[in-house]
A protein has these predicted regions:
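Glycine-rich adenosine-cofactor-binding loop
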Residues: 11, 101-106, 113, 117, ...
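Glycine-biased, low-complexity coil/linker segments
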Residues: 295-296, 307-310
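Adenosine-phosphate binding glycine-rich loop
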Residues: 123, 221, 225-285
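Conserved S-adenosyl-L-methionine
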Residues: 144-149, 241-244
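NAD(P)-binding Rossmann-fold cofactor-contacting core
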Residues: 147-171
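Rossmann-like adenosine-cofactor binding region
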Residues: 173-245
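Phosphate/diphosphate ligand-binding glycine-rich loop within oxidoreductases
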Residues: 2-119
């Protein structure tokens, strides 16, 4: 109808995003007269696109995905604490003609850990593969949740060390950055409770695992932010070794649910959102997964193998 609220997803590309299916299902389940649409926009056009939102009486809210999350950070009027910490915006909320920038990636990640794996980070050690925007959101959320040690492993060691220093400085956590060939890395992986892949290694079915799977041990949780394919080589090898495994659909779902609540003030039907995601992917989660996991490729992965650029919605 003419009064329908419009919700948009900014990105480039956006054609294969699962967010429209998920959010439109949530709007319908909530009885909200609204439509969530993908809006492909180049970086040069993003400022004008954001400005157009201010003049829309029926603007309901927006998501931001690659490659615009960092640019969106500078285009909003105010920021949530999470967005300010991560340095990126994935959710935009209209507040009295002003635009509030939020980042739901980290909280979405934590919720997926709690809800789908009954995993509490407090007092546990974690290894993060990658050092880009996705790794930043994950590392910050784990540090704030009380993880005992966060080991950031990246091909470019300077990026890993820089992120570790930021987490230690801002949150007072115990984080270290290591290169892929650091002799300390194997033992850190063997002895951790959680391994998180935030890189794009695994998006292609021919990709090998991003680390040597012989380092994985029974009982640890191996979480790959990639959700398409639902089972990456890393998760497949982890399952063989008796690990608990998770893909990225959970994170995509929960970060989207948090965004919906910010826009509407209502909690969405997460079941309707989950069903829409699974239908959009067109395949079922592997039996080893605690629940359906991931979508466009990843919930929030870094686009360069073990280097990374930024998160994806």
């Amino acid at each position: 109808t003419a009064a329908a609220k419009v919700f948009v997803l900014f990105g480039d590309p956006v054609e294969h995003s699962l967010s429209p299916a998920m959010q439109n299902a949530a709007l319908q389940a909530a009885g909200i007269d609204g439509l969530y649409i993908p809006w492909r926009v180049k970086s040069v056009g993003l400022p004008a696109a954001f400005e157009s939102l201010r003049g829309m009486d029926n603007f309901g809210g927006a998501n931001v995905t690659l490659p615009h999350k960092e640019q969106a950070f500078s285009l909003v009027d105010t920021l949530t604490q999470e967005a300010a910490s991560v340095g990126a915006v994935n959710t935009v909320v209209a507040r009295g003609g002003r635009l509030l920038g939020a980042n739901t990636d980290g909280q979405g990640f934590l919720r997926s850990l709690h809800e789908e794996a009954a995993f509490l980070p407090r007092g546990k050690s974690a290894v993060i593969l990658g050092a880009g925007g996705a790794a930043r959101a994950v590392s910050i959320s784990l540090a704030e949740a009380g993880a005992e040690e966060i080991v950031i492993v990246n091909r470019t060691i300077e990026r890993a060390q820089s992120l570790a220093e930021f987490v230690n400085r801002e949150i007072g956590a115990s984080a270290i950055g290591l290169g892929l060939d650091d002799p300390r890395m194997p033992d850190r992986v063997r002895n951790c409770a959680l391994v998180v892949n935030t890189t794009s290694v695994g998006l292609s079915p021919s990709d090998p695992p991003p680390i040597d799977p012989s380092l994985l041990r029974p009982g640890m949780l191996v979480y790959d932010l990639i959700y398409r394919p639902l089972e990456t080589a890393l998760l497949r090898e982890a399952t063989k070794r008796g690990c608990q495994v998770m893909g990225g659909l959970g994170m995509l779902l929960y970060q989207g649910a948090l965004a919906f609540e910010l826009w509407t003030g209502q909690k969405p039907s997460e079941e309707a959102m989950r069903q829409a995601l699974v239908a959009a992917i067109g395949q079922k989660a592997p039996p080893s997964s605690p629940s359906p996991s991931r979508g466009e490729g990843t919930a929030c992965v870094d686009s360069s193998p073990l280097v990374g650029k930024g998160p994806l919605t």
